[in-house]
């Protein structure tokens, strides 16, 4: 069931499907009931991932309390990306950090004084919100250029600095198993246990 300290459901999608979700949403979804939100040049939502919100509910998160966006019970959707090796991996993580900073547009906290100072400096260099989004989107293109089928590992680049370090064997996502969740049968990655141990350690 739900963890008592969490307030939403997290869903993974391969990068190509993740991008198609946002593009196809206006055509196929019940847009009166549900909103699909992602920061663009025209809309700032304060997240570095996509959020699907139930418009018939209210759930306001403190960092977003002043934003003019639908704020309700949400599903957070994260892309899965191919994970290269060597210098390409280092550059991928650098671009993921740039993406995260300029899309969230918030000084990093809880990562040490150096990261906080560098984040504040980088945001100060580009003060306009639209310019920050443009820089973030350019970094997103660079970090997501590696296809899953061309790599031996998978990573998650839109879940924050800690998780972008993780490298998951592709076998974790090679198939699907179904498990009961709150009375519903839900699909999970076949290697969910290995994934959870890499992401959270002794998660039980």
Give the ranges of each region predicted by the language model.
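Active-site nucleotide-donor binding segment shared across nucleotidyl transfer reactions
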Residues: 1-9, 13-20, 171, 198-199
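A contiguous, mid-domain pocket- or channel-lining segment that forms the substrate-recognition surface
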Residues: 95
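Short, conserved acidic/polar surface loops in the N-terminal third of protein domains
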Residues: 23-24, 89
